[in-house]
Amino acid sequence: MCGSKPTDALRTLPERAFRLRARLIAVGLCAVCFAGLIGRLFWLQLCTGGWYTQRALGQQLRDTVVPADRGKIYSADGALLAANSSCWTLRASPREMPEEKLALAAKGLAEILELDEAKLLEKFNDRRSNDCLLRYRVERETADAVRDFCAANGITGVRINQDSKRWYPQGEFLASVLGFTNVDNAGVSGLELEYNDTLTGQNGVVLTAVNAWGYTLAQSYETELVPVEGSGLRLTIDANIQHYLENALNYAVQEHHVAARSVGIVLEVNTGAVLAMATTPAYDPNQPRVIADKAARAAVDALSGKERAAALQLAQQTQWRNKAVSDLYEPGSVFKLITCAAALDAGAITRHSTFYCGDSISVAGTRFHCANHKRHGSQTVTQALENSCNQSFIQIGARLGKQAFCDYFAAFGLREPTGIDLPAEPKKSLYYTADRMGPVELASCAFGQSSKISYLEMAAAVCAVVNGGKLMQPYLVSDILAPDGSILRHNQPVCKRQVIQPATSATMREMMEAVVLYGGGRNAQIAGYRVGGKSGTSQKLDSADEKARIASFVAVAPIDDPQFLCLVCLDEPHSWTTAGGSLSAPVCAEVLEQTLVYKGVPRATDTGSADAQAAALPADGDSFDGA
């Protein structure tokens, strides 16, 4: 027994070594596995943890956007022009709806919301869906009907979320200036588009917890970020003056059977502030896709298919277009104010210069005549303006010369956008440059044909003629407002440049008053106020109708202390005449008289002699090239 112990000891050595190696291998394997686990945890926690967290939150949270109200728009006198009204968006979560009541829900909701029952039931049967839109922005009555139906029938899973939409409380009023918004409350045209970033608020959000099956948990789990209303606008537009302009313009359009859209503008002469701006016929920005003009709507309804769709789109784009800013026109004899001011300022003529008007005048082989072939004989510059004499202004243009004419044309801002804070202003007008202008082109441009400018450009240029020679930038927004009504930014008037000398401007004011007292502008006279103006009746050179005319008039009052300018243009009137002095001048007089009284400008007490003298003088008729 004793002799076997060494042998047993030798036999246990390999076993011990084997066991040790086994332990070491086991420990090593454990270490490797542990290291792998640590590495995986490191990767999951630090490298991809954010991604998994977001996925988990996405499954556990449902976020509902709470749209912010757009900023409100007010007139200068405080009238609310654009605001927001409550509406409701209806959504459903099919997986939360009782399966046995899906058919009942589809039938009832389809009836209330005027939807297709079969299609609605198909949506509800998709139990994987957690969200489907039923109707977007419905009125309170519809939302209440859905709420009552669901409550009465024990239907869950239908969500009624309060929303807001743009609302224009005064309908068509100022529509072409305000513009409108789309279904997402983003500006599409007008001030809504130009100031979209300013008016747009910061949306809020409601985070709602959901369980593993997608069902909404108790309201105590909700988190809400409150929406922030956008900034508001206070305009230079005075609601009272805007009403004066729209009422007078609408009456004239109906009275004289105006075929195309007509324009009216009222500016503050010394600042460029737009007090009123209208394009007729207007449209309702609450229903911008409904064609407001009856004739245009009838023409669209008479078509079908693709033709109708194209005609509808064109009609909509036409009614949305602010013609006062976006369209170009031949200004006609109103432009003679620019030619006259330029020639006086350049020293090419004086107010006492005389010109002769016979049967016609020949320029490079082309004959020009005055309206109705009138012969005015010898006349001063003032008389030529009173008579709107084409032949005299052809001679004035020739004395000024094409280079100086083009220089003043540019200086009066007629080759560039006015810079008004509205979209869709043309980048440039249509005109001749000096290197492309021959004697005939200079002659026709001198009395207001052969060039096309915007209505607003013409109004701004005449302001410079009478306000001492300063070209002011027209503008519409006076103040940017915080939601509480406090002023965030005030816009100051901008003088672009000095165009003519103050003395020239003073002379032009006297001559414009003579036009209203003794010439073709007598229909613009206002009892107790001194008024200056000029008429125009321009031929539409790009129209297929050779008889198509634009009857226009521009008036300034009081002319001895210029404050307000009114430009009215009736596009294609079909009346007893097409003369601007007969059709448009009375509109200017009505608007300016109401404005002067409203603004508290006192009437003169003794104007009888001037009125009687003016009434005793014969009016010089005006036509397409002599108005």
Give, region by region, the residue ranges found by the protein language model.
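Beta-lactam-recognizing serine transpeptidase/beta-lactamase-like catalytic domain environment
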Residues: 2-13, 82, 211-224, 269-334, ...
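Periplasmic/cell-envelope proteins involved in peptidoglycan metabolism and beta-lactam response
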Residues: 1-303, 319, 328, 403-413, ...
